[in-house]
């Protein structure tokens, strides 16, 4: 008989944590641990001091949350939080461990024990995808990333930039980026535009809090207070980090009905799981 691990269901509310109990094969949890240990984005963070577990996906304020955990654990302030903090690869520096760094039994405890506090953040999929485009495809990432430059060049090739009167060096338009994501998403889940249900695995991780990017200061403040962080420190841990210089546009200026439908179908599970409306692109300000 297969070993079973009891977990709870994730909720869309930022005060989640009391969902129905479900049973999950321990082998599936171990499969998740094996995947996490090879995750190049190092999305999971385990704070032993505060006994909390965080999974951070790109464009959901993950730099701010990771930096906060990094500092709360007593690690040195980094000269350049992005991208050093995410890669955990700076020589001579120490970092908060990832789940894959732990022995399997310890990691199972982090995922299943009521003694551990688990949280994550989500974002409206329309807004998150456009934010990823602005940060990595529309212009050079900061610092420049050869990886995302190659993706931009791949899109230009797929869409035949340089032909039919299109300049080869033209900025990749958002619609072409969306088409690229749709074509590659089944095989290539990038940390910054992956399906959130794929990256957060709510089927395996019982999150006590699922915070929202749209109410980040309030939700992360609640997380920090629950962890017992001193009240005078909290405002410094809520300051924006790694914000782009491009002014926010209403999503209705970016999407039309067809493009919104295309993105909705790509991220349908994210919309339903985390409580975002299909037509939310029309009401964004």
What are these regions (language model features)?
Residues 1-285:
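Membrane-interface amphipathic segments in extracytoplasmic regions
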């Amino acid at each position: 008989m297969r070993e079973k691990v009891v977990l709870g269901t994730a909720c869309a509310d930022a005060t989640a944590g009391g969902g129905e109990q479900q049973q999950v094969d321990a082998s599936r949890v171990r499969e998740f641990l094996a995947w996490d240990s090879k995750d190049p984005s190092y999305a999971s963070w385990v704070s032993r001091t505060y006994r909390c577990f965080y999974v951070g996906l790109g464009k959901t304020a993950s730099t701010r949350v990771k930096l906060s955990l990094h500092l709360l654990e007593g690690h040195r302030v980094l000269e350049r939080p992005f991208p050093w903090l995410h890669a955990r690869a700076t020589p001579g520096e120490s970092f908060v461990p990832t789940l894959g760094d732990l022995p399997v039994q310890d990691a199972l405890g982090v995922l299943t024990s009521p003694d551990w506090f688990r949280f994550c953040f989500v974002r409206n999929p329309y807004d998150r995808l456009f934010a990823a485009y602005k940060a990595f495809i529309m212009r050079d990432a900061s610092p420049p990333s050869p990886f995302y430059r190659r993706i931009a060049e791949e899109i230009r090739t797929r869409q035949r930039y340089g032909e039919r009167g299109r300049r080869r060096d033209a900025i990749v338009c958002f619609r072409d980026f969306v088409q690229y994501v749709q074509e590659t998403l089944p095989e290539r889940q990038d940390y910054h535009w992956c399906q959130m249900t794929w990256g957060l695995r709510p089927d395996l991780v019982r999150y006590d809090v699922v915070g929202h990017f749209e109410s980040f200061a309030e939700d992360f403040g609640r997380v920090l207070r629950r962890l017992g962080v001193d009240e005078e420190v909290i405002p410094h841990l809520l300051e924006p980090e790694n914000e782009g210089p491009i002014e926010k546009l209403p999503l209705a200026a970016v999407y039309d009905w067809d493009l919104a439908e295309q993105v909705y179908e790509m991220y349908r599970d994210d919309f339903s799981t985390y409580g975002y409306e299909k037509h939310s692109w029309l009401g964004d300000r």
